[in-house]
Amino acid sequence: MTPPPNSISSRNVAVIGAGAAGLVAARELRREGHTVTIFERQKQVGGLWVCTPNVEPDLLSIDPDRTVVHSSVYQSLRTNLPRECMGYSDFPFVTRPDDESRDPRRYPDHREVMRYLQDFAKEFKIEEMIRFETEVFRVEPTAENSCKWRVQFRSSSGVSGEDIFDAVVICNGHFTEPRLAHIPGIESWPGKQIHSHNYRVSDPFKGQVVIVIGYQSSGSDISRDIAILAKEVHIAAKSDAYAKESSIYSNLHFHPTIDRVYEDGSVVFQDGKLIFADAIVHCTGYKYCFPFLETKGYVNVEDNRVGPLYKHVFPPALAPGLSFIGLPSMALQFFMFEIQSRWVASVLSGRVKLPSEEQMMEDVIAFYAKLKSLGIPKRFTHFLTDPQWTPMFEKLKPHEAVLISQSEYFNWIAEQCGCSSIERWREEQYNIAIKKDDDNFRDEWDDDDQIIQEAYRDFAKFKPSKVWST
């Protein structure tokens, strides 16, 4: 697994994106001895955590020629996980008592996460690797069977250029291109429609009857945010489990999915109940989108499956020169970015070996076949979770838990790299948090104090960051 020291090599690597994935990818690559260039279209680090009041002119984000806004952060957004388990392994996301402008809450708002990422970039001198306000519009192999990659880019001033790299790591996120559910009659429904990507504040829905489609993180948050000002909020969700939800909001109602909508403004649910509504908010998730990537068919996106990819990271035919960080959802994102990046960096240096292309493809094909045999749609390929905690997989039997848990996934990567995997306390905090009551869980929690103390004992191993005293 580990080659002799003289076979370790340094690569010239491009990282696409300076969000939470791109920042830690750059750090891990440089730690492994690689030369790194990060391309970031915005003026600052942070990726999806960069909050802007701007929304797209097409509130459903259907128009392919629209001006794209690359943030989906709404004003009231707070983390849905406690800060201790959110951070990178060796850069604790703890409170900042030395700075009164910081959010000290255990479930802080989006601004605090943004400040944490800025602190991380400063501590590890990552900004010196970034080309800000530079959009990548083409990534492709330089030639057939080539081990080099051409990256073409354009600055905000309109100046274009290209560079050649040994490898490209894709960290562009997947919260920009919305998915929409198919609803019969929606084209002629007269009310206002908006995707959560373009939701910022609840004011436009004051006094209205609002339908919220979807009840994952954004649907849960946004429905409650709107309920403060709206006349009624009706949530349409796929799982029967949501029908059992209770809420402190008397105007918040749960329904099964929508059967059809009509020109008179009515919305009919699968159980036959009819509501006349003023607006529909689509909290229906996002599509994986890589408009800049040209691989001559080696990597495709089909029904939100990016593939073929070995362990959600490497396309067998193009490995290790092309890799993806952060595709799996329903997992501890920052920790996952970090351990995936460590694996990629180690493979690129030659310190860790991948299986052959044929062996990787066999693994991918077997995984896809298992998903198909269980009737799991392609769009759930990158769900990294225990099915018993995910209502959409509630009909699966325990032995059918083909979607491996995040701890199994992290442990497997850690074994490849010879590094530490997820800490016990971090996993337990995550498991507790995802089962919390939606109304109050951010301000009322019953975590075992020993788990929290264990986290802070781990944090004490790391020297206080220089940024804490600035």
From Swiss-Prot:
Its cofactor is FAD. It holds the Pfam family FMO-like. The keyword Translocase does not apply. It comes from the Eukaryota. NADP(+) binds at G214, Y215, Q216, S217, S218, G219. GO terms for molecular function: flavin adenine dinucleotide binding; N,N-dimethylaniline monooxygenase activity; NADP binding. One of its GO terms (biological process) is glucosinolate biosynthetic process. Belongs to the FMO family. Catalyzes the conversion of methylthioalkyl glucosinolates of any chain length into methylsulfinylalkyl glucosinolates. This is Flavin-containing monooxygenase FMO GS-OX-like 6. The lineage of its organism: Eukaryota, Viridiplantae, Streptophyta, Embryophyta, Tracheophyta.
